Regions:
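Glycine-rich phosphate-binding loops of nucleotide-dependent enzymes
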Residues: 2-280
Length: 280
């Protein structure tokens, strides 16, 4: 069995009196495409925000390659050392910030496309490459020598070839058809050279042809870049076709997990999310 790239252990995320994620445990192994599905408001994007260090969980841990990178309140032996007011110290000591998690090889896309509207396709990807080298745009732009800059430009062009956007490299990002804007956002994530890619509703707003193309594209990039992928998606044909395994959450709580065949037959999943499939 391949090694774990991601593991969530008993993760809870509470906002005041609202429990967005409720004692969730899950794992993703190297090379897998795993989907996280559930109704709107089930806590899926909150899970992504916990994994990437945007949110610090109320309880639980996130592990990347078997190392804790995000932690809520301490447990076990650590609870004795860091109790009361010291619990916050433990969390600050363990939890990585989003930029540090990115440097560990994690990249994500968002439900709402976040491209630089005034930049070309090429520039959007080039900026993503720059940001992996230094901490801000200013230093990324002005501290590269000519040789490094030229190599980044070559790498950017090569990536655009791989993802099928070379012909559009000089077009403004916002001038692209919607499906290609989604592809560009994924290309920006790939520019950071991740080993673990999180896709938040990549098929949102796509027509059937674009969705079919996206399905093939995700398969291709997994193979080409040796990726492990976790995705949130409401498009069930895509989910069932592409996923090695599926986790289903409802009101932040895990209600089922397994292969697509198992999930499609699970009564709790049908009742909560998929709906009743009528006999033909």
């Amino acid at each position: 069995m391949s090694e774990k790239v991601l593991e969530l252990r008993d993760v809870t995320m509470q906002f005041g009196g609202v429990v967005a994620v409720n004692n969730l445990s899950m794992e993703v192994r190297k090379g897998e495409i795993v989907s996280l599905i559930g109704p709107n408001g089930a806590g899926k994007t909150t899970v992504f925000n916990v994994i990437t260090g945007v949110y610090v969980p109320t309880n639980g841990e996130v592990l990347l390659d078997d190392k804790v990178v995000v932690a809520g309140h301490p447990k076990g032996k650590m609870k004795k050392l860091y109790n009361g007011e010291n619990a916050g110290k433990y969390t600050r000591m363990i939890t990585k910030t989003p930029d540090k998690i990115t440097r560990l090889g994690v990249a994500r896309t968002f439900q709402n496309i976040r491209l630089f509207k005034s930049m070309t396709v090429f520039e959007n990807v080039l900026v993503a490459k720059h940001m992996t080298r230094t901490s801000n745009v200013f230093s990324a732009t002005f501290r590269l020598n000519h040789k490094e800059e030229e190599q980044m430009r070559k790498d950017t062009l090569e990536l655009l070839k791989i993802v099928g956007l070379e012909a559009e490299k000089d077009e403004l990002a916002t001038s692209l058809p919607y499906g290609k804007q989604r592809r560009l956002e994924i290309a920006r994530a790939l520019a950071t050279k991740p080993k673990f890619l999180l896709l938040d509703e990549p098929a949102a707003g796509m027509n059937p042809q674009e969705t079919d193309e996206l399905t093939a594209f995700i398969h291709d990039i997994r193979k080409t870049f040796d990726l492990t992928i976790l995705l949130i998606e409401h498009h069930m044909n895509l989910v069932m076709d592409i996923s090695d395994r599926i986790y289903v959450v409802d009101f932040g709580k895990l209600i089922a997990s397994g292969t697509s065949d198992v999930i499609q037959k699970d009564k709790k999943v049908i009742d909560a999310y998929l709906g009743v499939v009528e006999d033909e």
